[in-house]
Amino acid sequence: NNQNFTNGKAKDFIKSDEKKLIKYENLGIILNNNDLSLHQLLKEKGMVFECCLLYKEHKNILINNFQKKICEDVKNNDPNVVSVNNFHDIYKWLKDKNIKNLILPYETVGNKVFHESNFLKTITNLEVKYTFYLREWDGNAFQYATKGFFNFKKNISTLLNQANIKNKI
């Protein structure tokens, strides 16, 4: 049953269920700026996986320096995270680690890195099944993020209640 892995367009607003992912062997996760902590969530669930972090330089030197420090922090906190710099590095990592099932961070509009047809076609040709992982928080928040920040802002308390986060003040 591969219903959690889709080789095609990421399904809109279908929340991922890590319980279904636990049973997959040869599991890999790719981190990037869209989600730098997904591996921690899955590690807490006791899942066994390989992990790499895609770092792409930004044109703005301040943003680039900031992103470099964050990526260094991720790698320092988990020495099992492998750095990759481009899609070819990812393909090599997939082959070297014998990854057959791949988790990618869910990508929002304007933030697409992996939802690129040549990349997806190549990993499919490598016989790797993939899924774009949508965190529950993001799935709940997307419905309020359609009309600008102020619509989102007025619904923050609703989101906090859904996440069972209470104001401690």
Locate predicted features.
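Trp/Phe/Arg-rich N-terminal binding region typifying the photolyase-homology
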Residues: 2-169
